[in-house]
Regions:
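Membrane-proximal linker segments that couple transmembrane helices to downstream signaling/catalytic modules
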Residues: 2-100, 116-119, 126
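The short coil/loop that forms the "turn" connecting the two helices of the helix-turn-helix
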Residues: 55, 107-108
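Key DNA-contact positions within bacterial/archaeal DNA-binding proteins
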Residues: 58, 110-111
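Conserved short loop/turn motifs at secondary-structure junctions
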Residues: 103
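Long cytosolic C-terminal regulatory regions of eukaryotic multi-pass membrane proteins
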Residues: 131-134
Length: 134
């Protein structure tokens, strides 16, 4: 009976080990994205992230999926959207168009910005910005 018990414990241990490694990698991804605001570079790919962290894109994807339920692009876009919202709220960026703010936040085009923003906030960036005006 003892052998059966051990057989059951090993996979659980492996899963726990895997999830700890996955959590660690996720934290490294977060740090890498936020340090120097790498998400502002529209060309910064999961592959580049993998190279920096000395891993591969499969592990990057798995770590993000395990910790957020989403994928690399969703995660990067969340940072970009948060950044864009902050810029729209700040008088420092009042001279920029909504499109320019989207590009500065790291979106590759106006369309990409509007689509991601509308999908998450259910409002266009322009309408959001107008709603901020006193």
């Amino acid at each position: 009976a003892m052998n059966e018990k051990n057989d059951k414990e090993i996979p659980a241990y492996r899963t726990r080990l895997k999830s700890e490694r996955s959590d660690r990698l996720y934290v490294q991804i977060l740090e890498e994205l936020t340090r120097n605001k790498r998400y502002r570079d529209p060309a910064f790919t999961a592959r580049q992230m993998a190279e920096i962290l000395h891993t591969n894109t499969r592990y990057i994807s798995a770590a993000i999926a395990n910790c957020t339920g989403g994928n690399y692009n969703m995660m990067v876009n969340k940072f970009r959207l948060r950044d864009a919202c902050r810029m729209m709220q700040s008088p420092r960026y009042a001279h920029l168009t909504t499109e320019e703010i989207g590009l500065l936040a790291g979106f590759s085009s106006r369309q990409a910005f509007y689509l991601a923003f509308s999908r998450v906030y259910d409002i266009t960036p322009r309408a959001y910005r107008l709603g901020l005006k006193p």
